[in-house]
UniProtKB/Swiss-Prot annotation:
Residue(s) carrying Phosphotyrosine: 25
Annotated positions binding heme b: 88
Gene label: HBA
Matching SUPFAM superfamilies: Globin-like (SSF46458)
InterPro entries for the chain: Globin (IPR000971), Globin-like_sf (IPR009050), Globin/Proto (IPR012292), Hemoglobin_a-typ (IPR002338), Hemoglobin_oxygen_transport (IPR050056), Hemoglobin_pi (IPR002339)
Tissue: Red blood cells.
Family that this chain belongs to: Belongs to the globin family.
Entry protein name: Hemoglobin subunit alpha
Length: 142
């Protein structure tokens, strides 16, 4: 999926609004995913997936940091996410549908917190961005 110049501007602007809340929002998105799609917990058998868990917070920060890195490398998402793609495809063997589920939960989380700051155009751009990230993360499954 090709990100337009407007999409890239919307993504960067939204990431600036997220600011220092990335880890918090990442953890909340994971909690939302675990609650809404319980089968996703099977990839975290060693985690305490309860609300406020230190492990979920830590992984939420990793998710947020990876997405922030991707948002800063919009012209080279495959390069920015190559190591994560390898990890998820070859070591963790995560079902690719889970990236879409987490992306949806992240959009809901951002809409909850940013409210009017997440315009329809920004929402559409983030949706395209998360779909692109999902595509890159699953590219090494083939």
């Amino acid at each position: 999926m090709v990100l337009s110049a407007d999409d890239k501007a919307n993504i960067k602007a939204t990431w600036e609004k997220i600011g220092g809340h990335g880890a918090e929002y990442g953890a909340e998105a994971l909690e939302r995913m675990f609650a809404s799609f319980p089968t996703t917990k099977t990839y975290f058998p060693h985690f305490d997936v309860s609300h406020g868990s230190a492990q979920v917070k830590s992984h939420g920060k990793k998710v947020a940091d990876a997405l922030a890195n991707a948002a800063h490398h919009l012209d080279d998402l495959p390069g920015a996410l190559s190591a994560l793609s390898d990890l998820h495809a070859h070591k963790l063997r995560v079902d690719p549908v889970n990236f879409k589920l987490l992306g949806h939960c992240l959009l809901v989380t951002l809409a909850t917190h940013l409210q009017a700051g997440l315009t329809p155009a920004a929402h559409a751009s983030l949706d395209k961005f998360l779909a692109s990230v999902s595509t890159v993360l699953t590219s090494k499954y083939r």
